[in-house]
Regions:
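Local sequence-structure signature of Cys/Sec-based thiol-disulfide redox active-site neighborhoods
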Residues: 1-33
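Short glycine-/acidic-enriched loop or helix-start segments at secondary-structure transitions
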Residues: 15-16, 40, 77-79
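Short, glycine/charged-enriched secondary-structure capping and boundary segments
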Residues: 18-21, 45, 81-82
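Thiol-based oxidoreductase modules, predominantly thioredoxin-like and allied folds used
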Residues: 28-50
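Major-groove DNA-recognition helix of helix-turn-helix-type DNA-binding domains
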Residues: 52-54
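Thiol/disulfide oxidoreductase modules built on the thioredoxin-like
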Residues: 56-63
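A short, hydrophobic beta-strand/beta-hairpin element that forms part of a small beta-sheet core
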Residues: 63-74
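C-terminal cap of thioredoxin/glutaredoxin-like
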Residues: 72-83
């Protein structure tokens, strides 16, 4: 399984997700929004255009960690990735 994780090394939920994905031997590409302005800019474009984020934005959340699956699907649910 290959997955891109979009998050921050400062976010406990992101760290938990990275650990769980490592446990199942997933191939992880980590986009650390706290360390890369280009990754942050790309994430904000995704967040502004993807309907998955409407509830997150309305509640004032950031929406991380986010996961981009091999087929390009985006989910905010680690359970979807681990299936």
């Amino acid at each position: 399984m290959k997955v891109t994780v979009i998050g921050s090394h400062l976010c406990p939920d992101t760290l938990y997700a990275l650990n769980r994905l490592s446990e199942v031997k997933a191939e992880i590409e980590f986009k650390n929004l706290s360390a890369s302005l280009p990754d942050l800019k790309a994430y904000l474009a995704l967040r502004d255009s993807d309907p998955h984020y409407e509830a997150v934005k309305q509640s004032g959340g950031i929406g991380i960690p986010a996961f981009v699956l091999e087929d390009g699907a985006v989910t905010l649910d680690l359970g979807d990735v681990l299936k």
